[in-house]
Amino acid sequence: MTDVDVAIVGGGFHGCSAALNLARRGRRVLVLERDHVARHASGVNAGGVRTLLRHEAEIPLALAAREIWHRIADEVGDDCGYHTVGQVAVATNEAGRERLAQRHARMIELGWRHEQWFEADALRRWMPTLTEAASGGLGAPDDGAASPFHTTMAFARAARAAGAEIREGCAVTAIEVAADGRWSLTTGRGVVHAEQVVNTAGAWGDRIAAMIGDPVPLRYFLPMMMITARVPRFLAPVVISADPPLSFKQTPTGGLLIGGGRPARGDRDGTPDRIDLAGLRASADTVRRLFPGLGDVPVLRAWSGTEGQFDDGIPVLGPSLRAERVWHAFGFCGHGFQLAPIVGRLLAELVIDGRASLPIEAFSLRRF
């Protein structure tokens, strides 16, 4: 049997970030990962470090996280492949322009200034090969992108260096209260007793929550990505869109990384994901409409990951409603990568201080 202060279920980016922050504050931490670190969404996402077009409830967290990203090498001893390249949402018709203009006005009304309006000529100075149909856009020049697998592994190494233990291939099959009042977690590699439990199990977070009595209406999806052959550099910022869905960037080596949330087919219990070629083609067509001079570029590889989501588009972050000393952070709806550095810090605050330094009420389980 293993005794720790905090057991973290899930060894993705959020779990490793929580482990790092807790270990640095002197807690004995054990991360229990069913597969291996960065196996699922944390290692295969688009790597966007985005404050742009965030849900209003997420903005304080996203801005705080961005400050950490800007000094990420100081945080974990690794640059995580991070570059401040900016992110931009482009409108190509009047309806899209109006939606983005309304968003900009709303941000100003709320007192946020991280999103900036760009007229068409300013967009083309930023992206010279952009379509002439572009009529305006909303951008966040201080946003950026990083390497997701690289980043998650860097946080895992830093957590271990700070004293945390990470057990891979160690699925949690039951959680109950032990005779001494502590939490008892049954795993494939023995029993773990912990004073507190943190659930960062991603697309399986609802199952861990159910073990301690919290019913959660989590769904899962399998967002796809693809990478092309290298082409001469033509694009600096990350280009995003909600309608149609798109996340598009040129990597430092010249390849085009295209995603945006179009799903593959499959399940979360071992059935191999089946890439939806029609969905990939639709994403590629969107890129070519935005950058019509691009021409034909070979696609080298396509893949998907498994992510949890809620109907309202924001995660669960906060305490269990049914049990003491249990904390949840999952269901980030495909945009949790950027938030993980601050989420780990907030989880450490919740565990140790009993409160978070940023507003998290909107992410409570009480909303369901």
Whereabouts are the PLM-identified features?
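Helical element adjacent to the flavin cofactor pocket in flavoenzyme catalytic cores
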Residues: 138-195
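N-terminal Rossmann-like FAD-binding beta1-loop-alpha1 element of flavoenzymes
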Residues: 4-30
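Helix-loop-beta segment of a Rossmann-like dinucleotide-binding subdomain
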Residues: 79-91, 114-120, 124-162, 264-269, ...
